[in-house]
Design a protein with these regions (language model features):
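Alpha-helix boundary/interfacial micro-motifs
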Residues: 29-30, 63, 87-89, 94, ...
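C-terminal accessory regions of radical SAM enzymes
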Residues: 120-177
Length: 177
């Protein structure tokens, strides 16, 4: 911060499940409130973080101004394919409103290209999201069987044609038929 840097991205893929989240937030709160160090944070969390007592309110006091949440999808069948049974659209709104109540910018990720997706189902899901979910920014990514992932192994074993160039596996390229 002495060099003018006061915005940070904590690159824990799910800060809410970090066993030390509360002690980290407590120290950041102390730096902000007692030592008046202007810290702003972006963190990544899961869709159930709002159920952890005091997590969101402490996040605000610790300097969280933006939160990234991997919604993955709203279609229950797609969430099952992604093995994200904990992600439920019925919880999404409640969780998002808890962040909104603290004035925190919500940046979410959404995956397109599940086996059951069609242009019509994607349009319908986007309309539901626009109507029901209070998001500030929604980023769309293509379902990508990243090398080393379970999806990639399954497709490889089924001899599905996939891109040989590893630089194509960046969530924005189609890498299979």
């Amino acid at each position: 911060w002495a060099e003018g840097i006061h915005k940070f991205f904590i690159t824990d893929d799910n800060f809410a499940r970090n066993k030390e989240w509360e002690s980290i937030f407590d120290r950041l709160i102390e730096l902000r409130e007692k030592e008046k160090i202007p810290i702003g944070l972006l963190i990544q969390v899961d869709t159930l973080c709002h159920k952890i007592p005091n997590f969101i309110s402490k996040a605000k006091r610790a300097g969280v101004t933006r939160v990234f949440i991997g919604l993955e999808n709203i279609n229950p069948d797609n969430l099952a394919v992604a093995k994200k049974r904990q992600n439920k659209i019925t919880e999404y709104r409640k969780m998002l409103l808890a962040w909104k109540a603290q004035g925190i910018f919500i940046y979410a990720g959404y995956i397109l290209g599940f086996p059951g997706d069609t242009p019509e189902s994607i349009r319908r899901d986007i309309e539901i999201i626009q109507r029901e979910l209070p998001l500030d920014l929604l980023e769309f990514n293509i379902l990508t069987p990243l090398p080393g992932s379970e999806d990639h192994k399954i497709l490889w074993n089924k001899l599905v044609d996939m891109a040989a160039a590893l630089n194509k596996y960046r969530l924005e390229h189609f890498v299979r038929d």
